[in-house]
Amino acid sequence: VPVAAGLALALKLTNSDRLCVVVIGDGTLGEGVVYETLNIAAKWELPLLVVLENNLYAQSTHHSQTLGGDICARAEAFGIETVTADTWDPMSLIGKVQETVQAVRGSGRPRFLRIDTYRLNAHSKGDDDRSAAEVRSYWERDLLTRFAQEDSPLASRFQREAEERVAAAVVKAREAAEPEPLIPSAQAPSAPCRRWIRTEPGQNRRVVSAIQDALRRNMERDAR
């Protein structure tokens, strides 16, 4: 997020009509640097659009366990205008995104766009503690699920074309030869050892003491 603010500042200093977009999750609101960036973006009037994907979970922790208050209120506290949309109404989402981008371009000031959505699969492979009923309810609500259930020629055609493309990709991957490496090796050959030095048996001592002795011996050998 701070890097995005820096890019937005660079765009402002060059009098560009472009804007910088940074995408974060609801779990990112636990990071203090987010609020420092919102403050700077508001104070310096940076062309920054912060898009927050609110999928209710920070990895596997529901935001009700960690998030206090309202999400948009956090940006509004810095005087940043906020917009709310969701992925279940795509036409409305597209319209709000376009309006928000135009608002940032026109004013040069930051905006905060919250998009409510849901992650249908686990964050990782084995950390899904959500109830099966909750996940199932969102699968049933998902746009692709609803589209696939439509008894229409268009849905059937899209389904058939998708399956054909996946099958063709699998065949192509299986038939593809192993790619040749671009370079023989990514590691340089090691330098030959000039000589071996037999050392005295080690002592049981603290690492910091050994470091001090090594530094002292080197300083005694080298007057610099």
Where are the regions that the model predicts?
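Thiamine diphosphate
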Residues: 1-21, 184-224
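Terminal amphipathic helices with adjacent charged low-complexity linkers/tails
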Residues: 164-196
